[in-house]
Amino acid sequence: MTESQSYETRQARPAGQSLAERVARLVAIDPQAAAAVPDKAVAERATQQGLRLAQRIEAFLSGYGDRPALAQRAFEITKDPITGRAVATLLPKFETVSYRELLERSHAIASELANHAEAPVKAGEFIATIGFTSTDYTSLDIAGVLLGLTSVPLQTGATTDTLKAIAEETAPAVFGASVEHLDNAVTTALATPSVRRLLVFDYRQGVDEDREAVEAARSRLAEAGSAVLVDTLDEVIARGRALPRVALPPATDAGDDSLSLLIYTSGSTGTPKGAMYPERNVAQFWGGIWHNAFDDGDSAPDVPDIMVNFMPLSHVAGRIGLMGTLSSGGTTYFIAKSDLSTFFEDYSLARPTKLFFVPRICEMIYQHYQSELDRIGAADGSPQAEAIKTELREKLLGGRVLTAGSGSAPMSPELTAFIESVLQVHLVDGYGSTEAGPVWRDRKLVKPPVTEHKLIDVPELGYFSTDSPYPRGELAIKTQTILPGYYKRPETTAEVFDEDGFYLTGDVVAEVAPEEFVYVDRRKNVLKLSQGEFVALSKLEAAYGTSPLVRQISVYGSSQRSYLLAVVVPTPEALAKYGDGEAVKSALGDSLQKIAREEGLQSYEVPRDFIIETDPFTIENGILSDAGKTLRPKVKARYGERLEALYAQLAETQAGELRSIRVGAGERPVIETVQRAAAALLGASAAEVDPEAHFSDLGGDSLSALTYSNFLHEIFQVEVPVSVIVSAANNLRSVAAHIEKERSSGSDRPTFASVHGAGATTIRASDLKLEKFLDAQTLAAAPSLPRPASEVRTVLLTGSNGWLGRFLALAWLERLVPQGGKVVVIVRGKDDKAAKARLDSVFESGDPALLAHYEDLADKGLEVLAGDFSDADLGLRKADWDRLADEVDLIVHSGALVNHVLPYSQLFGPNVVGTAEVAKLALTKRLKPVTYLSTVAVAVGVEPSAFEEDGDIRDVSAVRSIDEGYANGYGNSKWAGEVLLREAYEHAGLPVRVFRSDMILAHRKYTGQLNVPDQFTRLILSLLATGIAPKSFYQLDATGGRQRAHYDGIPVDFTAEAITTLGLAGSDGYHSFDVFNPHHDGVGLDEFVDWLVEAGHPISRVDDYAEWLSRFETSLRGLPEAQRQHSVLPLLHAFAQPAPAIDGSPFQTKNFQSSVQEAKVGAEHDIPHLDKALIVKYAEDIKQLGLL
């Protein structure tokens, strides 16, 4: 899933009065609100069956008569004191136009157009308009309907090339333009032969700028020899008032299918295309489905509708607000300036009862809040912060908001919660589209108009309707408000409908409950980076947009790169505080990093660098659509070249920095080189890399750690194992200390190269001689050491915080504590206290009984020492080493660096040299039997029938290859440990018990105790998260049916008990045990899936294995990072083909099974069969740990 995927649920409605109570209170004390209550009788007359759209509009406008319909800011003509020019100065009040006056103005315009002597316009022709929403614009738009014209509202941010293309496609007879956009209109009209009239609206008589704009337009047209007639709308209305009203459009054969409106989409993915609105669809804006589709769920029809409209009529949202208010008898107030600079002033004057916001407006409100906090030095949540919210609500937003909604684009839960906290009302989440109409309200389908829906798999992004726990995919719907398609674009229309007639929204959603959806992302907003990671650009922008320093941000990426860039517009406050240079860039970088940490984003989701843009993205500069959405093609067109150059510069800088680090390393402190190398390889600034930071905290993983290790080795000529770099106990300062220690000691410790030869591709048992690892004195004394103690009272355990190690610690404590004995464990940590805390944490899985049991035993018989078994003397203080050499009776070496990707050379230090250090302690002062935990991977490369369970490993596997096979390095390193212990047995008679485990499964009793990183847990999690499994994990029989197969795994509780019991008996000799499950019981992966399905987990089977694997991988890549990290994706190559169907274990387990039976280990006194209870517990434990 995307986000287990934990989809945010809607916040509870803010506490307080119900909507009905708030409406009643406001109406009782506010005459304007009382006068704006809808009239049911008007609505019934206007929406009766059989009325054409023009008749419906006329019924509303005449029905509400003298009520105020529209309001615009009043202004006065003043003289500019500097230029002396006549300018318009806004006054702190609005002037209104009544419904009756609006109808008369619209009729006058229609009459003048129809009866013009030189260029009459008739029904069926097109009228294009461009401008900011206003009284004039509304009048002209309604006039078009009365005359039977097809309206083509154009986006004010469109380029002239786009405008000309649309005009060419629609061939308008009339072009209406506001003064602000008159120049573009003239350019378009000159290129469009069909245009006969150019109407200028929002013309302010007496304002020099407006007069000059109209004169310039007439001059340009005249000079070009154009016959286009230019009139102001006021002139048209004045002439039209003297003319008879035009007859409303009569019924036609097309009826309400007549084309009434074309809404051209923003073109966020390319050339705009005109969505066709027949009359019946436009009618839904006027008291129809659109009107109440996004109202609050408990709204009553008597909510007074007073709104401020800032949305353009070229966008559906602008029409919803305007026409919805006009069909409710309310008043629409228009924002005074298109750049929204008067936003708060207009709202405080208008005092709306209903709000409709888009995320861009909510972000603006949030930034105002943040700026006020910064100005007074207050913190969020403080009394001063609440006072700012109160001022926002009561003064700047008018103080009488009853309902509020948001739409046009998804909004983050955090921003939603903030707006609700300001307004103290529920913010309705409305989702719809230009083509389909309203789709959901507060995530629940709006029915009607939606009649059917389905989710369509998006395999390339990993979204499937079979996903668990929620189906995901592209939302496809059938709806009563669906449009017939795109104007003159039959091919494009066909692309957005499937073969069953469902409209393809292009939006990926998750169905979290029946007919309840959560938006995931636009299908085209997801980018795959070069390393295979998917990033959702719009989600990242929403997250980073909450920064108090970010005004706007556009995240940029390329599938040829492994990281992201961005274009960032800082807030005015940020620019005022930091300037527009490196200071603001540094502050922004810190802010983005902080948000990334808070949001749990991955390193590749954080822009590595960005361009600072001081000019905001606007409609005017073409970066924003009329609805305020960032147009990615426009961003790419404007900044793409600079961003690609930045990519090249970063790559060159990294290469140069690495060269610089190499050249001057000998003259710098080691820690400086370590920091700079980490910064260069991980794309960070060296100044920002703290020496106390852990490599993984900087975004590093095991593979980047390998690159880092090799680079440091190249510089310092000492081994810097990956185990040192990725150790939870180590930071960069620790890495530097390791290097300094290795350099000062002369690095005489054994290495892969000194033992096997540099660049060796095969390794031999004969290479691994004790004299290469242990000092001559220890080896000389070993053969004559006292024999092991007759009674085991003190056990030394390594790897106790590992998966098996924790239960070995528990098992030994259970045995020794009642006898007064103790268990000593070595754990990495900066000191003993930190080491103890690391061990304690592995028992905190959510099972209080386990934790209490461990703590009780630990208090009585556990000693924790900070150390590292791969270091000299196990990383212990000399006094502790000497004491343990005297006290310890038996050593259990469970510790290892378990990594199935790293090569043998990188695992040589922790796993081979570490085992030699254990052998050294076992051969000091007196012999101490060793229990050694090995792996089934040791058997790789040897025929199963030839792999002798209790044979001499030096003969059974004398020569091994080094290759890139799965777990080759790990298997070789554990094999080498076995060889060394066999050498110690042969040299000094050291008793050894080797246990080679295959899959060690979850604990059958304790909650949450499973090995999250192992392949089996990853597979179960992945099956549950994706909801798909193959028909069979094994090769099918000749008829295509499933075959009996067996899964070789043993629960950890039994494994620990068996190893402890058999290890305790190992006071002499050398014996090996293959800890496998040998039963021929037909219990395999297919049965595990059966059991999960029977337990109610939704998993669908895919018949074709290759198809399943492809879908499975795609789904896994689409999981949220927290799940993807723990999925089987890194190990998916193990499932590349169906496995052979083997019912039983291919390896010999006779020695282990007979020893278990003889010692009566476990309740069954035998190796247990796997059962349904354990597999179902896996699912429960995975959920318990928060991974689903």
UniProtKB/Swiss-Prot annotation:
Enzyme class: oxidoreductase
UniProt effect for mutating residue 900 to P/N: Loss of activity
Keyword Cytoplasm: no
A GO CC annotation given for this chain: membrane
Span of domain Carrier: 665-743
UniProt keyword annotations, A-Z: ATP-binding, NADP, Nucleotide-binding, Oxidoreductase, Phosphopantetheine, Phosphoprotein
Catalysed conversion reaction: a carboxylate + ATP + NADPH + H(+) = an aldehyde + AMP + diphosphate + NADP(+)
Record note on domains: The N-terminal domain likely catalyzes substrate activation by formation of an initial acyl-AMP intermediate, the central region contains the phosphopantetheine attachment site, and the C-terminal domain catalyzes the reduction by NADPH of the intermediate thioester formed from the attack of the phosphopantetheine thiol at the carbonyl carbon of acyl-AMP. Large-scale domain motions occur between the adenylation and thiolation states. Phosphopantetheine binding alters the orientation of a key Asp, resulting in a productive orientation of the bound nicotinamide.
The name this protein goes by in its record: Carboxylic acid reductase
Protein species of origin: Segniliparus rugosus (strain ATCC BAA-974 / DSM 45345 / CCUG 50838 / CIP 108380 / JCM 13579 / CDC 945)
Highest classification ranks of the organism: Bacteria, Bacillati, Actinomycetota, Actinomycetes, Mycobacteriales
Gene: car
